[in-house]
């Protein structure tokens, strides 16, 4: 459980909210510290004070956004048909995709985890598709992220969603 819940009016909370918007719309490298500080109406020093670095802020907001995504996807898998895991996994992919598009989290969720961080999306999908193939989870996670990046780069969401619908998961 999280030790700190952001208060949107505090400098730390404003930074977190600004970072979610900035990193959702642009890649990590495209977001400048000065832009984050200006959007949050704080000095750049506040970023270093509260998060240690731009990467620390990114990791903080990515973890939060990813947790919200996984909660929705886990719910879709759990609500799915036990006898048709393919339909449950496909529903989870679509629920997650719709959430990311609606909230504007295309870039932050479209990028794979940085460094040694565990890929929790791939782990969820691997667990949900274990009977089909041991590598299917990471493959589906990559396809899902590619759909988000396609939308971020101008593809219509319905086209990317249709591509996800075209994925077929069959037991071996």
Regions inferred by a protein language model and the residue ranges of each:
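Helix-turn-helix
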Residues: 11-14, 18-56, 60
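Amphipathic alpha-helical segments that line or abut small-molecule/effector binding pockets
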Residues: 17, 82-101, 134, 138, ...
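Hydrophobic alpha-helical connector segments
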Residues: 56, 60, 74-102, 120-122
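Alpha-helical DNA-contacting segments of helix-turn-helix folds
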Residues: 59-65, 110
């Amino acid at each position: 459980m999280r030790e700190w819940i952001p208060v949107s009016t505090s400098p730390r909370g404003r930074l977190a909210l600004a970072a979610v918007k900035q990193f959702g719309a642009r890649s990590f490298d495209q977001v400048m510290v000065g832009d984050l500080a200006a959007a949050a109406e704080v000095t750049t020093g506040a970023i270093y004070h509260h998060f240690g670095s731009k990467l620390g802020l990114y990791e903080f907001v990515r973890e939060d956004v990813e947790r919200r995504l996984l909660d929705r996807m886990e719910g879709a898998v759990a609500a799915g048909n036990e006898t048709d895991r393919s339909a449950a996994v496909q529903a989870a992919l679509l629920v997650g995709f719709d959430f990311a598009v609606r909230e504007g989290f295309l870039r932050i969720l479209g990028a794979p985890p940085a460094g040694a961080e565990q890929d929790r999306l791939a782990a969820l999908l691997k667990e949900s598709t274990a009977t089909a193939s041991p590598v299917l989870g990471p493959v589906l996670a990559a396809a899902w992220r590619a759909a988000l990046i396609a939308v971020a780069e101008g593809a219509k969401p319905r086209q990317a969603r249709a591509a996800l619908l075209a994925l077929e998961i069959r037991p071996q």
